[in-house]
Amino acid sequence: MNDRQAALDQALKQIEKQFGKGSIMKLGEHSDQNISTISSGSLALDIALGVGGYPRGRIIEVYGPESSGKTTVALHAIAEVQAQGGTAAFIDAEHALDPAYAKNLGVNIDELLLSQPDTGEQALEIAEALVRSGAVDMLVIDSVAALVPRAEIEGEMGDAHVGLQARLMSQALRKLSGVINKSKTIAIFINQIREKVGVMFGNPEITPGGRALKFYSTVRLEVRRAEQLKQGTDVMGNKTKIKVVKNKVAPPFRIAEVDIMYGEGISREGELVDMAAEVDVINKSGSWYSYKEERIGQGRENAKQYLKEHTDIRDEISKRVREEYEIDGSSKEPLDEKEETLSLLDDE
């Protein structure tokens, strides 16, 4: 047994000498066994994700129909990263980012890194350079469907380019996945949906870009509008369902229901009223909502308005709800501690 252990120790020393310290270790020796996360900017989504937010160093795919709220979900995450002192980058392959809307959601547009690349190859090379720097906490690519290969742009209309985009994504993700993990960057890929022709049974919907992104993603979120939110006859927003269809760090298939209001994004007060009522932090009796035996509004909209006006009570309720769901942020790391990450990337 001692000979076997000595041989193993010798092999480990050789591996570390050849590939660098930390290239192999016992799992129990790893200093951080908890999953480090950054809040999604939505309490309901943090709870649905099971770990209190997006896991750092992982790939996230957000997909759904047009105008369902995919970019809104990503922009809320960027705002949360910036609020914690982190750096975020947005690769706008669709050339459709609205800076005024992003600002309304809490994004610091003066500090947001923005790229509007001409080709898919250029977009993914920029993404790789940003991730390899080790200085970017969140990278959003909007969208995979708009990552057009160079050959397609330079070709004629009507030319067939079978599988080009899928091959591009497959190669890019092979290169990116390892360095994303080492740099602790959260990479959010926004994707659209398409329909297969001639599917008689089952779901005909597919996401563009091949299968690679499905495999490499730690979390996949499906965003869909459920119903319109009206004030009188005016449509003020949409009730949106965000389904966690894949999750490698917690149980999947949980659903977060949020109100996405036009011009404002996700209503924090709306989801807080729903989640607090679910765990009896807020009491609901008939149409009345009350907190600590004090009535805060008749009907959901009035309760939302009360919390909007009384931010101290809103923050207190939010803290209690997070404690009830055990997502008090204990696994989070400071975003400005980059020295170890940078040294790991320099070793490459």
From Swiss-Prot:
Region described as Disordered: spans on this chain: 325-348
InterPro entries, sorted: AAA+_ATPase (IPR003593), DNA_recomb/repair_RecA (IPR013765), DNA_recomb/repair_RecA_CS (IPR020584), P-loop_NTPase (IPR027417), RecA-like_C (IPR049261), RecA-like_N (IPR049428), RecA_ATP-bd (IPR020588), RecA_C_sf (IPR023400)
GO cellular component, one term: cytoplasm
Keywords for the protein's UniProt record, in alphabetical order: ATP-binding, Cytoplasm, DNA damage, DNA recombination, DNA repair, DNA-binding, Nucleotide-binding, SOS response
Localisation: Cytoplasm
Biased composition (Basic and acidic residues): 325-335
Alphabetized Pfam families for the sequence: RecA (PF00154), RecA_C (PF21096)
UniProt binding sites for ATP: 64-71
SUPFAM superfamilies noted in UniProt: P-loop containing nucleoside triphosphate hydrolases, RecA protein, C-terminal domain
UniProt GO molecular function: ATP binding; ATP hydrolysis activity; ATP-dependent DNA damage sensor activity; damaged DNA binding; single-stranded DNA binding
DNA damage listed as a keyword: yes
GO biological process: one example: DNA recombination
Keyword match Ion transport: no
Main subcellular localisation: cytoplasm
Domain of life: Bacteria
Entry function: Can catalyze the hydrolysis of ATP in the presence of single-stranded DNA, the ATP-dependent uptake of single-stranded DNA by duplex DNA, and the ATP-dependent hybridization of homologous single-stranded DNAs. It interacts with LexA causing its activation and leading to its autocatalytic cleavage.
Family note: Belongs to the RecA family.
HAMAP family on file: RecA
Protein name (record): Protein RecA
Organism (species): Listeria monocytogenes serovar 1/2a (strain ATCC BAA-679 / EGD-e)
